């Protein structure tokens, strides 16, 4: 899609869309009218597409037929082009042109002269009788010769000019196909066809022989004739000059298919008219093969498509062992059947032998590589190569070298080299003698010459550099190397120098050296920008920043040095913490960063190692040795001490340093630095000075990887080398410093972990090691009192008490959390490194905040805007990767914001107020605003959420509410000089810098936040996801962190390590159900959505930040352990009075036996005899299957690349997953790309469930459903009448068959009992108190394997509706009853795929189907949702007609109209797990099809659910236009010659399964480890295609044949033989299975039960003894009649459809007992 089209697609205004559509319609209406002038003929779609390639528009309204319309249209277009070149006011002579075509030239008939003569017999009919040898008389300067030049000789053309002195310029159209020079078929078969004979070839426009033109092969010389002169003029144009001109020049102006426009003019002798170098006619896809056999006629003679050759070569090389038979089969597979006629069988045999020959050659390179050679070996490489070439020329090439020469094909170009030709006559029409060798020789020589220069450049490269893999050395060796290169380069030609320059630019970074100058102290983000264009950087490019300048380090990467009074006394460089990387064992490594690349002056890398250079420095001059390498000391550098100090350590801590410069990609495996020279337990400092790399650590419990960038450093703690190993990989060229010490530098782990991390600007209060100063000492209880719950506490120090008093705290005694003392205040030790802002430089509205900060013992510091963070946020906004409001703004405005974010360089005053929730961070600000109303108009308050904005408005009612805004609205509104960013940790990363960049009037930014709470989360696709949070960015400006709260009492605050003001109150409760009134906090968005739908006030743990609530309910479920500490702290710090915990996550008990696990199952099926289960544990024996002989041969296919196309086209997980509004689905499973192609729909996927509910479920009240039923009675009657007519339903109403009903009930129960135990353990649905109309909805778990859904965008899943079990058994009984009734009247021409085997369907297709006419198939849009009231009326009408009792129908209608779910009452629709789901879908499908179309008895049709296929595309009923509006069901008809039905393809040879479908399903089963479970069923599906033998070539295309072969191979490898599909149905019928297992068993069958007796029964002839009571002589038939009458007379109105009514309906209504007798 073009950019303009994308802009139009973004139009959303309906009026604009309508205007755009109208403009498109007008343009489409005008263009065909213009096209009719050139293209008045109707063309087929392939012809129209071909013409459009030539820039010719056709009209869809053209109706005039023509035998060769496309060719004629091209002819007209050529004349139109010529008309643009002709002079408008001068007369032109038109030769061989019909008068009816004068309009194509854009000229008037009276203006020009027509000179037509007979050149061939058909010209007599065109132009009248003229002398065939006459020459046209031309009295004008310009002339046009139409479609005749190809019949003329150069002498005739010369004669035309010589007889007409006034003729200067001639436009001629030439019709000759360029492919005829190579005897190739037509390049444009839709326009013309070609046939080749001995001396001639035929050009057939449109493939119509009646309009064919026959040419001799000699006429093709016109395609390379650029100049025509007199006889022998090429030898001497002076001895035999022309009368008027020296020669004629011919220029090719245009080519369209075989039509060419030639421009011929006189050329004077004094004019130097050079020949063009080449004429190009068409792009070529044809090639010839090199000669590999002797004699030459044994080689491939013909020309073949390049794609065909390459595909065959790759096929032969990719198959493990290819045979000649495989090659022939592959050729048959890749060549279309209609194309076979143009190939010579003899040449195909030669072609197959060519492929077989090259496949047997060695495909592994036998050339040597200098990569592993030493310096001497590399210098001798060129000598060895020359010797090898010399001996190969004498003794013959190696197999690999020969293979390289014969695999490259010889291109056949559709070009000509223009020539000078003599004006000959009859000789012109003789066939030229083409020479392949002369045509290809110049190209071969050029190729050989080019390869020679390339090899020379390669050898010189090796000699000059000495080592290909050697990194950049110091500058001392560069002049010598350069001089040598210049001396050798002087011997090369110009072309050699050019080639060598190109090679060295790409291969050797030293020739010429690729240098990139970087300004000192460049920030990291600037360095990254400059290195994007050169990803493979040398170390000189990225490590030119000197540590000698650390004394002048600015704040925040500024280019201006700070003042003297702001510099650190210990030269401590400003650093940031990039992250903490925990190991599996609990060890943590903190990575800090200078934010830029660094370099120590004076480092000289002299030691060469594999993949790196090194230098070693030590204070005592001692060297360093380890396995394989040894380093001598180069002394010590002053810059090394500065680097140690910059990392926060004392210089005396380390006395040795190893400097290493890594090449890109070099690595060091896992090892430990346990040399004896170093004491055990010593610390090691590693500085990644420049470049990128990964540092892996491994212990016994797992591995962790650290990503290192420019300026990163970290320390391996004491004892690390004894417990861990580490490795290094250089992602880019990398420079590193490793500091060690030979004396003990480790310290024992302190018992007082209060030391502040030197590199954290403001530490986490939860980490007691981040305290500044010694506030208290953690003491452990005595050994004798280990059970004591409160630790020893020390008084709070004076600075802490003072800070607490300033914030209104009176609880000044120490508190604890049960294990250790809580610190109320955490001071920032490094705050003195920040530069303070000057109050006098600020505007008057900002100055009161300086006094406020001073009163709180806080400072206001200067912050330089971070352009990298600002640009990342604004770029994400512009690209619609973050936010909902801002991306919709004007694109120009967003672009200007991005530009400001990139370029704004200014400092802003920052006041950072950090504290716990309820610490009073914003209280002082609000009091200041209340006391100074004039300040309210000079500030803006920016908040992350609407809830927080409402909180500010409530606390400042006198303030203009427009001054309080969310962060996205803040970007749109005007700015003020002071901006308060409340709870700024929840703002997107980079927003603060971006806002300050685009709002240039902001002088003071006040930041309030809590670094212990959760921060803003962003998707991974955005740039800001890689940035550190705002808290981490600005915490360095916070003087202290106030870890105390006024909000919560000690009972709630101390457990989360917060000092509390309130000593009393607070409660922690536990409940089993969620309370009604309190706010509910849940861990996941999906739970929040569900509770909100139920009317609860719910928020997520992280989303409640900023709120204060009295009472709070926190739900604990399976997602709670996944939440971070920050998120849990946020949730626990919200409540001020009580927290109620509700545990909703319960463990599932182990499954029990069937009856014990489901207590209601016994009462439900107590009357089903248990002896039906006898023998169920006896496995059925597999039938003996004989081998089926192979009837055809399919070429071996490569199994590794079959799914590559879909894998490459597949989008990433985040793009494919569906967004439910709260979270994404989880349909893409595992890391296997093949498995990822298949969506895995799972019942536990809450996001998918929500999307599926929205897509599949419709809601309506019972009243609305009843109203719809009344309004659609006529529609239901129409459906039934059409159904009855087509399905031959008896006209009389059928009586109720009690015996059939009982039999169907037995079938339903047996099927139910045959299910797995897990399916039966649905105790709730068997509960008698479970409402009859209640439905449980859940997702269907499945792997989606449909062809159109594999690798495609994900869609909603399928729902399963779980009814009460007795309801299901009753409706299933009804469905089975109706099925049996339907089978009694179903016509033979209708096949319903229900309880039918594929063999039966195959027989139906083979014996009845008509493939000689177009077939019809149809799909539906939302079929289940469209089974509404009209179809329910049809079902009830049909069931009533077939004798189903009214009480059953009333109950069925009730559950359809009163279906209750957790969402509410459902509309009338089809639900899965209904009893009659499949049967009702099928019947409704038949009825709809019969109502819409006229279906006669001659139509064969197959139906199954919503699938249908017919062998005839029937006429639509005339009344359908009036009936269509009655139905919401919409069909998508398709008339095709390749019908599909239920996954089967219907063919003349029978039904077959799609091999692509089978292959994909097998691949999924293989990767899931389930192949043994599915291989037999897949083999049965595969069998139908396997049995066809050679006929599969008529059914499958090339891709399907490959998949068929791979399926065959997979099944054979898994031990499968061709199975028998069998004639039995795979239904759950225990009785039939027993008969298979024990053929001696006796079957006793009645209408009430089917039983199997393993032993011969003992029969008593007269069981009832003679007595005094009279015997009942009533006939059984009359008893049955009485029972049925009693059942049918049961009033439907008496049914309440609740309680045990369904139980009575199912158990007693037709058992011969009254429902009321119990």
UniProtKB/Swiss-Prot annotation:
Entry-linked PROSITE patterns: ALPHAVIRUS_MT (PS51743), FE2OG_OXY (PS51471), PSRV_HELICASE (PS51657), RDRP_SSRNA_POS (PS50507)
Domain called Fe2OG dioxygenase: residue spans: 653-743
Start and end residues of each Alphavirus-like MT domain: 59-223
Keywords tagged on the record: ATP-binding, Helicase, Hydrolase, Multifunctional enzyme, Nucleotide-binding, Nucleotidyltransferase, RNA-directed RNA polymerase, Transferase, Viral RNA replication
Domain (+)RNA virus helicase ATP-binding: 889-1042
Biological process per Gene Ontology, one example term: viral RNA genome replication
Residue ranges annotated for the (+)RNA virus helicase C-terminal domain, each copy included: 1043-1176
Signal sequence, renumbered to the chain: none
Residue ranges of the region described as Disordered: 467-513, 548-578, 746-796
EC code(s) of this entry: 2.7.7.48, 3.6.4.13
Polar residues composition bias: residue spans: 467-496, 556-568, 756-773
Pfam family, one: 2OG-FeII_Oxy_2
Molecular functions per Gene Ontology: ATP binding; ATP hydrolysis activity; mRNA methyltransferase activity; RNA binding; RNA helicase activity; RNA-directed RNA polymerase activity
Catalytic reactions of this protein: RNA(n) + a ribonucleoside 5'-triphosphate = RNA(n+1) + diphosphate; ATP + H2O = ADP + phosphate + H(+)
Location of the RdRp catalytic domain: 1413-1520
Sites where the protein binds ATP: 915-922
Entry similarity comment: Belongs to the potexvirus/carlavirus RNA replication protein family.
Function as written in the Swiss-Prot or TrEMBL entry: RNA replication. The central part of this protein possibly functions as an ATP-binding helicase.
Name of this protein: RNA replication protein
Provenance organism: Shallot virus X
Lineage start: Viruses, Riboviria, Orthornavirae, Kitrinoviricota, Alsuviricetes
């Amino acid at each position: 899609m073009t950019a303009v089209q994308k802009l139009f697609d973004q139009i959303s205004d309906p009026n604009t869309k309508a205007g755009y559509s109208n403009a498109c319609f007008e343009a489409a209406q005008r263009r065909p009218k213009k096209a009719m002038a050139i293209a008045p003929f109707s063309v087929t779609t392939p012809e129209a597409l071909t013409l459009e390639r030539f820039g010719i528009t056709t009209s869809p309204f053209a109706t005039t037929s023509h035998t060769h319309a496309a060719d004629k249209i091209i002819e007209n277009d050529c004349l139109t082009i010529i008309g643009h070149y002709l002079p408008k006011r001068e007369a032109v002579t038109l030769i061989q042109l019909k008068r009816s075509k004068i309009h194509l030239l854009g000229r008037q008939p009276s203006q020009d002269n027509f000179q037509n003569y007979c050149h061939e017999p058909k010209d007599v009919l065109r132009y009248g009788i003229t002398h065939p040898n006459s020459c046209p008389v031309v009295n004008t300067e310009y002339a046009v010769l139409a479609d005749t030049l190809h019949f003329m000789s150069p002498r005739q053309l010369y004669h035309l000019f010589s007889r007409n002195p006034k003729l200067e310029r001639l436009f001629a159209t030439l019709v000759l196909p360029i492919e005829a020079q190579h005897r190739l078929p037509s390049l444009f078969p839709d326009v013309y066809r070609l046939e080749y004979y001995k001396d001639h070839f035929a050009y057939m426009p449109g493939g119509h022989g009646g309009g064919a033109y026959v040419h001799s092969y000699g006429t093709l010389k016109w395609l390379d004739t650029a100049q025509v002169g007199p006889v022998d003029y090429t030898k001497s144009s002076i001895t035999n000059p022309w009368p008027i001109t020296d020669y004629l020049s011919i220029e090719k102006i245009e080519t369209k298919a075989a039509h060419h426009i030639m421009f011929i003019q006189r050329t004077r002798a004094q004019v130097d008219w050079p020949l063009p170098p080449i004429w190009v006619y068409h792009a070529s896809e044809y090639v010839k093969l090199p000669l590999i056999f002797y004699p030459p006629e044994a080689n491939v003679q013909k020309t073949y498509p390049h794609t065909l050759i390459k595909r065959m070569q790759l096929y032969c090389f990719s198959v493990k062992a290819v045979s000649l038979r495989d090659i022939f089969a592959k050729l048959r597979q890749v060549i279309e059947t209609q194309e076979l006629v143009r190939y010579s069988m003899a040449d195909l045999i030669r072609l197959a032998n060519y492929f077989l020959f090259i496949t047997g050659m060695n495909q592994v390179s036998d050339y040597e590589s200098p990569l592993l050679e030493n310096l001497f070996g590399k210098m001798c490489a060129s000598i060895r190569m020359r010797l090898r070439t010399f001996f190969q020329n004498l003794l013959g090439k190696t197999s690999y070298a020969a293979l390289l020469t014969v695999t490259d094909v010889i291109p056949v170009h559709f070009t000509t080299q223009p020539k000078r030709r003599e004006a000959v006559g009859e000789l012109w029409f003789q066939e030229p003698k083409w020479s392949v060798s002369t045509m290809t020789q110049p190209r071969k020589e050029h190729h050989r010459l080019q390869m020679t220069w390339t090899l020379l450049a390669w050898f010189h490269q090796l000699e000059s550099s000495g080592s290909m893999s050697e990194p950049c050395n110091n500058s001392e060796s560069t002049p010598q190397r350069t001089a040598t290169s210049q001396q050798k380069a002087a011997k090369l030609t110009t072309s050699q120098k050019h080639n060598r320059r190109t090679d060295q630019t790409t291969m050797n970074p030293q020739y010429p050296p690729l240098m990139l100058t970087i300004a000192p102290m460049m920030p990291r983000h600037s360095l990254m920008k400059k290195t994007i264009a050169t990803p493979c950087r040398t170390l000189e490019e990225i490590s030119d920043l000197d540590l000698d300048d650390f004394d002048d380090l600015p704040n925040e990467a500024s280019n201006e040095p700070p003042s003297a009074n702001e510099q650190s006394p210990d030269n401590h460089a400003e650093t940031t913490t990039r992250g903490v990387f925990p190991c599996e064992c609990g060890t943590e490594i903190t990575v800090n960063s200078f934010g830029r690349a660094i370099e120590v002056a004076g480092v000289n890398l002299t030691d060469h190692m594999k993949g790196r250079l090194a230098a070693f420095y030590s204070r005592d001059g001692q060297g360093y040795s380890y396995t394989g390498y040894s380093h001598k000391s180069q002394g010590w550098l002053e810059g090394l001490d500065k680097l140690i100090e910059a990392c926060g350590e004392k210089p005396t801590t380390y006395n040795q340093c190893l400097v290493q410069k890594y090449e890109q990609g070099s690595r060091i495996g896992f090892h430990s630095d346990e040399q004896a020279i170093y004491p055990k337990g010593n610390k090691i400092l590693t500085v990644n000075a420049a470049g990128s790399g990964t540092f892996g650590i491994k212990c016994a419990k797992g591995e962790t990887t650290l990503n290192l960038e420019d300026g990163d450093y970290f320390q391996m703690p004491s004892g690390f080398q004894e417990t861990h190993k580490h490795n290094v990989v250089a992602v880019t060229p990398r420079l590193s410093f490793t500091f060690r010490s030979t004396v003990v530098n480790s310290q024992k782990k302190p018992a007082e972990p209060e030391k502040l991390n030197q590199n954290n600007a403001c530490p986490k209060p939860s980490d007691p090691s981040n305290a500044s100063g010694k506030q208290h000492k953690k003491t452990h209880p005595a050994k004798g009192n280990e059970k004591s719950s409160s630790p020893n506490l020390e008084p709070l120090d004076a600075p802490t008490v003072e800070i607490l008093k300033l914030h209104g705290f009176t609880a000044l005694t120490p508190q604890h959390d049960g294990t250790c003392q809580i610190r109320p205040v955490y001071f920032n030790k490094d705050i003195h490194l920040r530069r303070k802002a000057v109050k006098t430089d600020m505007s008057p509205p900002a100055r009161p905040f300086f006094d406020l900060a001073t009163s709180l013992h806080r400072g206001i510091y200067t912050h330089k805007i971070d352009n990298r963070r600002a640009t990342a946020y604004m770029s994400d906004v512009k690209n619609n990767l973050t936010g909902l409001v801002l991306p919709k703004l004007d694109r120009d405005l967003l672009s200007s914001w991005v530009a400001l974010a990139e370029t704004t360089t200014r400092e802003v005053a920052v006041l950072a107020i950090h504290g716990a929730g309820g610490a009073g961070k914003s209280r002082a600000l609000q009091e200041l605003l209340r006391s100074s109303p004039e300040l309210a108009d000079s500030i803006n308050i920016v908040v992350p959420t609407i809830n927080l904005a409402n909180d500010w408005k409530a606390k400042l009612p006198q303030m203009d509410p427009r001054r309080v805004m969310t962060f996205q609205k803040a970007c749109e509104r005007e700015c003020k000089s002071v901006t308060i960013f409340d709870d700024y940790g929840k703002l997107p990363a980079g927003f603060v810098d971006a806002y300050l960049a685009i709002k240039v009037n902001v002088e003071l930014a006040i930041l309030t936040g809590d670094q212990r709470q959760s921060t803003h989360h962003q998707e991974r696709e955005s740039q800001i996801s890689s940035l550190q949070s705002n808290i981490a960015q600005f915490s360095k400006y916070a003087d202290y962190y106030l870890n105390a709260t006024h909000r919560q009492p000690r009972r709630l605050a101390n457990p989360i390590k917060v000092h509390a003001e309130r000593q009393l109150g607070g409660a922690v409760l536990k409940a089993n159900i969620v309370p009604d009134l309190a706010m509910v906090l849940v861990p996941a968005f999906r739970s929040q959505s569900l509770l909100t739908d139920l009317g609860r006030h719910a928020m997520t743990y992280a989303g409640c930040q900023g709120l204060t609530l009295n009472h709070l309910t926190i739900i604990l479920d399976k997602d709670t352990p996944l939440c971070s500490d920050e998120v849990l702290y946020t949730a626990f710090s919200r409540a001020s009075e009580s927290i109620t915990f509700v545990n909703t996550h319960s463990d599932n008990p182990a499954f029990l036996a069937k009856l014990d696990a489901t207590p209601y199952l016994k009462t439900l099926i107590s009357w089903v005899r248990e002896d039906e289960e006898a023998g169920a544990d006896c496995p059925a024996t597999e039938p003996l299957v004989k081998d089926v002989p192979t009837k055809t041969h399919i070429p071996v296919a490569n199994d590794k690349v079959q799914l590559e196309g879909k894998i490459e086209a597949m989008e990433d997980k985040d793009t494919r997953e569906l967004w439910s509004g709260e979270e994404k689905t989880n349909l893409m499973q595992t890391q296997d790309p093949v498995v990822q192609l298949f969506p895995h729909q799972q019942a536990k996927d809450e996001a998918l469930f929500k999307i599926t509910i929205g897509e599949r479920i419709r809601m309506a009240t019972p009243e609305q459903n009843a109203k719809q039923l009344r309004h659609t009675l006529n529609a239901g009657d129409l459906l039934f009448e059409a159904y009855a007519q087509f399905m031959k339903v008896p006209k009389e109403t059928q009586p109720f068959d009690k015996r059939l009903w009982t039999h169907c009930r037995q079938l339903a129960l047996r099927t139910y009992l045959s299910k797995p135990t897990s399916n039966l353990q649905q105790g709730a649905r068997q509960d008698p108190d479970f409402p009859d109309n209640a439905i449980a909805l859940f997702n269907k778990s499945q792997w989606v394997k449909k062809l159109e859904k594999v690798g495609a965008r994900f869609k909603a899943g399928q729902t399963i509706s779980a009814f009460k079990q007795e309801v299901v058994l009753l409706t299933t009984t009804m469905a089975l009853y109706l099925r049996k009734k339907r089978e009694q009247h179903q016509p033979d021409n209708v096949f319903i795929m229900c309880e039918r085997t594929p063999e039966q369907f195959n027989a139906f297709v083979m014996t009845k189907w008509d493939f000689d006419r177009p077939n019809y198939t149809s799909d539906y849009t939302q079929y289940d949702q469209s089974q509404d009231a009209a179809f329910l009326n049809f079902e009830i009408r049909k069931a009533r007609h077939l004798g189903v009792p009214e009480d059953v129908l009333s109950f069925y209608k009730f559950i359809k109209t009163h279906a209750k779910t957790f969402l509410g009452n459902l509309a009338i629709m089809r639900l899965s797990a209904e009893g009659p789901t499949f049967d009702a879908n099928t019947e409704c499908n038949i009825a709809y099809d019969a109502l819409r179309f006229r279906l006669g008895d001659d139509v064969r049709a197959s139906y199954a659910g919503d699938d249908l296929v017919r062998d005839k595309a029937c006429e639509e009923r005339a009344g359908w236009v009036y009936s269509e509006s009655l139905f919401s069901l919409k069909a998508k008809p398709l008339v095709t010659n390749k019908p599909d039905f239920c996954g089967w393809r219907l063919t003349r040879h029978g039904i077959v399964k799609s091999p692509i479908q089978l292959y994909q399903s097998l691949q999924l089963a293989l990767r899931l480890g389930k192949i043994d479970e599915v291989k037999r069923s897949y083999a049965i599906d595969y069998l139908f295609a396997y049995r066809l033998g050679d006929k599969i070539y008529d059914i499958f295309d090339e891709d399907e044949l490959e998949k068929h072969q791979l399926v065959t191979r997979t099944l054979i490898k898994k031990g499968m033989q061709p199975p028998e599909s069998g004639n039995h149905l795979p239904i759950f019928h225990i009785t039939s299975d027993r008969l298979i297992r024990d053929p001696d068993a006796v079957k006793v069958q009645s209408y009430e039960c089917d039983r199997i007796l393993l032993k011969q029964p003992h029969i008593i002839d007269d069981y009832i003894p003679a007595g005094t009571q009279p015997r009942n002589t009533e006939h059984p038939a009359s008893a049955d009649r009485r029972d049925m009458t009693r059942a049918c007379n049961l009033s439907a109105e008496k049914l309440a459809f609740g309680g045990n009514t369904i139980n009575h309906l199912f158990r007693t209504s037709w058992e011969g007992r009254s429902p009321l007798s119990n």
